[in-house]
Regions:
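A charged, aromatic-enriched C-terminal amphipathic alpha-helix characteristic of glycosyltransferases
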Residues: 103-132
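Short alpha-helical segment that forms part of, or immediately flanks, the ligand-binding pocket
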Residues: 30, 53-57, 71-72
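A short hydrophobic beta-strand element within the catalytic core of glycosyltransferases
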Residues: 39-40
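Aromatic "clamp/platform" in nucleotide-sugar-dependent glycosyltransferases that forms part
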Residues: 44
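Short hydrophobic beta-strand element within catalytic cores of glycosyltransferases
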Residues: 61-64
Length: 133
């Protein structure tokens, strides 16, 4: 089953989408992520990029194109799997790898949850305060 979450536009006609979420209220986003197993993030340019972090917090895994914003906290084969932008076959292979390798999937989930814990707002607030001290 494939879900598509967007704040701007509907999926293209050729996308195979079972569920489409548009403009989800912030307090409901976690529920959407928790209903999914794998996040595929294809953005090539972003700032910090929260979706993989949100997916980790809900116990899911991410297959991601590395970009300036997400490489601050994502590590290939540690808390996500990377694939090269535009290489659809590599993206599919990464998803299949996660589906077929429970040990890898469990490792990425565990490390992803550690990463998400490190980026909780309360911890980030303290890090910002420490910078100004």
């Amino acid at each position: 089953e494939i879900s598509y979450l967007s704040y701007r536009k509907e999926p293209k006609d050729w996308y195979r989408v079972d569920r489409f979420y548009n403009r989800i209220a912030p307090e409901k986003v976690g529920e959407v992520y928790a209903s999914c197993d794998i996040l595929i993030k294809t953005s090539i340019v972003e700032s910090f990029s929260y979706p993989p972090l949100e997916m980790m917090a809900t116990g899911g895994v991410s297959v991601v194109v590395p970009n300036g914003g997400n490489v601050e906290y994502l590590k290939d084969d540690y808390n996500c799997l990377f694939y090269r932008q535009g290489d659809i076959d590599a993206g599919v292979a990464a998803v299949e790898k996660l589906l077929n390798d429970k040990k890898l999937r469990d490792k990425i989930i565990k490390n992803g949850q550690k990463t998400a814990q490190a980026y909780q707002w309360s911890k980030l607030e303290q890090r910002i305060v420490d910078i100004y001290k």
